[in-house]
């Protein structure tokens, strides 16, 4: 009996321990995980870190009240240290080398980490100011260009109106010139018809004159007995009177033969009379 009782008690204790362990696991599963512990330095914004490390420099002994021993170590940058850091920053905009940081910290009586953080915050502020300055310059340029674009739009609109007016005037002028050209063409055609009739009348007059010349008897251009012939001047006058040159009759000599009296010299007229 004692053995059985001891075994039963051990079983009961084991069951109690198992339930307790199971309850602990369930309780741990239901509980949220603990929040991670974040250092107070990481919770501060980047721009406030400069002010924090300004209290870590060596200078006046202004301790923060209500912070115990931690506040006793906080000091503020002196004006001389700030001027030295400002001059070094304006001289070297780039990131300082570790050797330069250590040398500057030793000269100012600061820690290299304080100098590095001060330069980091100073560069951040300088970049933000530079961005603001660049934005202001770009904004002014944009406003100037926008006003210029608006003025150009107004000029374009005015030029478009002027172009439309000039096109209307040109179209009206072309219409007027087209009407005047038609009238001029009609007048020229009528004048051409009148001149054609006049030319026909002139041709008729010339033909009548030629017929009159043909009706006239041909003048005696040569006199054989007196050995005289018509001069070229007389021939030209007769040719001027008639537009068309007339042929001589068969009983007369040609003009070229009469115009050269030298051809008659070797022909003695006496022999002709003797023969007759």
UniProtKB/Swiss-Prot annotation:
Tissue distribution: Expressed in seedlings, roots, stems, leaf sheaths and blades and panicles.
Places the protein is found: Nucleus
Keywords: DNA-binding, Homeobox, Nucleus, Transcription, Transcription regulation
Biased composition (Low complexity): 182-197
Leucine-zipper: annotated segments: 129-173
SMART domains: HOX
Main location: nucleus
Annotated disulfide bonds: none
Region (Disordered): 170-212
GO biological process terms held by the UniProt record: positive regulation of DNA-templated transcription
CDD domains: homeodomain
InterPro entries for this protein: HD (IPR001356), HDZip_class_I_plant (IPR045224), Homeobox_CS (IPR017970), Homeodomain-like_sf (IPR009057), HTH_motif (IPR000047), Leu_zip_homeo (IPR003106)
A GO term for molecular function: sequence-specific DNA binding
Inducing or repressing factors: In leaves by drought stress.
Residue ranges flagged as DNA-binding region: 70-130
Superkingdom of origin: Eukaryota
Its job: Probable transcription factor.
Similarity comment: family membership: Belongs to the HD-ZIP homeobox family. Class I subfamily.
Protein name from the UniProt record: Homeobox-leucine zipper protein HOX22
Species: Oryza sativa subsp. indica
Classification lineage: Eukaryota, Viridiplantae, Streptophyta, Embryophyta, Tracheophyta
